Amino acid sequence: MKRIVILTCPLSETVCTGGSCLKAFNERIRAFSRYKRENMELVAFMKCSGCGHFPGQDKGLDEKIQYVLDAKPDVVHVGICASKGKEKRKFCPEIEAITTIWEKAGIPIVRGTHSEF
């Protein structure tokens, strides 16, 4: 069973229902097509705590990060909404800080859900 977390940006909430990420997950398309032959479980669908909220400075964010660590996911998929810049290839500083913690814990990070970047 592939245990998966999806991380997205709260700034996208005005235009995003999460439906495209969930559709890609449920239909095993786009970034989730790599799991075509595996059982999958979505163990968390989370947003960071917003711009300016970094690990170690925001208790709620720290709790969310720890929840993911405790859930022991096999992989974290980061939505394109968490990218920045004209080319949409880099994480914002907050997402970069969060994913670095998980990577150091041995959790692979995949750039993409319904869109890959």
What are these regions (language model features)?
Residues M1-Q66, K88-F91:
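Conserved mixed alpha/beta catalytic, RNA-binding, or beta-rich assembly cores of soluble enzyme
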Residues C81:
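Flexible loop residues that form catalytic
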Residues E41, I101-W102, P108:
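Flanking helices and flexible, charged tails adjoining ferredoxin-like Fe-S electron-transfer domains
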Residues K72-P73:
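Proline-aspartate-enriched helix->loop->beta-strand connector
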Residues G106-F117:
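Divalent-metal-activated hydrolytic enzyme cores
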Residues E87-W102:
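Short Gly/Thr/Asp-enriched flexible loops that form oxyanion-binding sites at enzyme active sites
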